[in-house]
From Swiss-Prot:
PROSITE patterns reported for this sequence: FGGY_KINASES_1 (PS00933), FGGY_KINASES_2 (PS00445)
Protein family (similarity comment): Belongs to the FGGY kinase family.
Natural source organism: Rattus norvegicus (Rat)
Superkingdom field: Eukaryota
Span of the signal peptide: none
Nucleotide-binding as UniProt keyword: yes
Residues the record lists as binding beta-D-fructose 1,6-bisphosphate: G252
This protein's name: Glycerol kinase
Positions with a binding annotation for ATP: T20, S21, S22, T287, G332, G433
Positions of ADP binding: T20, R24, T287, G332, G433, N437
Amino acid sequence: MAAAKKAVLGPLVGAVDQGTSSTRFLVFNSKTAELLSHHQVEIKQEFPREGWVEQDPKEILQSVYECIEKTCEKLGQLNIDISNIKAIGVSNQRETTVVWDKLTGEPLYNAVVWLDLRTQSTVEKLSKRIPGNNNFVKSKTGLPLSTYFSAVKLRWLLDNVKKVQEAVEENRALFGTIDSWLIWSLTGGINGGVHCTDVTNASRTMLFNIHSLEWDKELCEFFGIPMEILPNVRSSSEIYGLMKISHSLKAGALEGVPISGCLGDQSAALVGQMCFQDGQAKNTYGTGCFLLCNTGHKCVFSEHGLLTTVAYKLGRDKPVYYALEGSVAIAGAVIRWLRDNLGIIKSSEEIEKLAKEVGTSYGCYFVPAFSGLYAPYWEPSARGIICGLTQFTNKCHIAFAALEAVCFQTREILDAMNRDCGIPLSHLQVDGGMTSNKILMQLQADILYIPVVKPSMPETTALGAAMAAGAAEGVGVWSLEPEDLSAVTMERFEPQINAEESEIRYSTWKKAVMKSIGWVTTQSPESGDPSIFCSLPLGFFIVSSMVMLIGARYISGIP
């Protein structure tokens, strides 16, 4: 019996979407933007000390191989020929820092994740050396001096990890964000791997001049970073190298396919949402929450706690676009915390059911400042609090308050963005894994008091990476001309409460935020010493701990 003929669907484009919580590989039809198949693998996070967050770079790389292999198998089962995959794009969690040995291909330390707080004392020491405080760094990079960005993570590795120090001295060390590590590995690694990054990821290191689009010598000297370990900076859409056979990839799947698109995850989502015009904005709900507004070819510097960053540069000879960004550290991560740390839910999907049971937080407010507060406060001394508890409060109210917290944080970012841009958004385009939660989307519309618009195909981050890869010179299978872009169907959520109620809830939230600030001294994450305990009387600490224990047992329904 003759084998079934493989389906011909026109040129296909793959996308690696490597996030904080998971890795995925997705394949799209370049003519219709239809998602044909994908595979996902969850990624572990390690917390070796209070405030430290790490991941294993080899586990991340292996997850990419697994996702590519499984997706190709699924395409085969659908009778789709994988030889039609003409390009691959990469989207990645930004700022997360990796240093590896270019001779062995081995990471020299775990990846230090963007959420990590260990560098707070490093930040404080550096800030005292800056003339005019943060303006020296911000004027060049668009970023405040913060634990969030790669430069201080790399400085910590150079100061504290002997393997890194030795590799730098012996000219064996390479630095990169996750995109650099993946592209180097996928294009051959120790056998000619390409050491590069794109402008969007480079702009999150605090070492990159967003005006000249080059590594900044003054910044590298200030942070004490040797420039020879930095990757080459390329545009977001060009051929970086070709996929090479790996022992981890069966039968050399996708051997020779160009890797030709690369964007940090939030820039990729901006492209995937087709926010190509000045003033268009999107909000992505993932581990964190990130609101980006395209400001065109102009750098707009915020007066209200937002970041200025590179949005994209879709080709070597194409112009650069910039964005204003509001970053929230904890969004989907709070759901994971309720599941893994408190056991209030057994799966992430369960939170919608719990919240729906009560339809209100009953005056309970949750500020999930587990890693301090990012935009618009940039306050590392903040810590998470749950307040407004009564004897009536149960786990359903806590679940509802957690969802509200994501929405309130987005409201704070949007308010800051409206003040900076001067033109309030008439609606908010959203994407990311959490947007499948309809209660969250309705809450967001209520709290913003504007419509929330969600694309029917939620994989906009991967789509953006695929678009950049397919549009690259030398690939040319995906047109980014406005008339050629596929129309996207949308689901719309309208506000269902009045403006007065929305404002009352928001103002109460802001009171809760103020209570979370100044909770800890900022030396503890680096030393591993929870110094806040030292500042509390012992009796108060014991009594408050007992109250929290009893409250947690009550909320969980334990007798």
